[in-house]
Amino acid sequence: MKITIFCLTILTLSITFGETNEDVKDGSLKEMDEMSLLQELMSVEAALVEKEMKAEAEENRDSREKRCWGLNVPCENENSPCCKPYVCEKTTGYGWWYKSPYCVRKGSG
């Protein structure tokens, strides 16, 4: 009888403390899972922020006004980037001397 009571007491204590140890293990596993999820979330957030910054830089680069050539600047052909009031034309004043068209006002050459 004493042995039975002793065995039941040990069994009860082992079950009680065994569950406590499992709770501690579960708690530490949950913390580790939370930390890994947090690190994963931070890496995803960093990637999204980097992507957004690249998109913003791309947008700023595309929205910048393109450079154009001013009055009396030599141009190569009609598709050269003369500024808006000017066009690339062969002129009688400069074209015959330098043998290239120039950016001039529309209708002046």
UniProtKB/Swiss-Prot annotation:
Disulfide bonds: C68-C83, C75-C88, C82-C103
Superkingdom in the source lineage: Eukaryota
GO cellular component: extracellular region
Location in or out of the cell: Secreted
Propeptide stretch(es), residue numbers: 19-67
InterPro entries per record: Toxin_22
Pfam families associated with the record: Toxin_22
Tissue expression notes: Expressed by the venom gland.
Comment, domains: The presence of a 'disulfide through disulfide knot' structurally defines this protein as a knottin.
Record-stated family: Belongs to the neurotoxin 14 (magi-1) family. 07 (Jztx-56) subfamily.
Protein name as catalogued: U6-hexatoxin-Hi1a
Organism for this UniProt entry: Hadronyche infensa
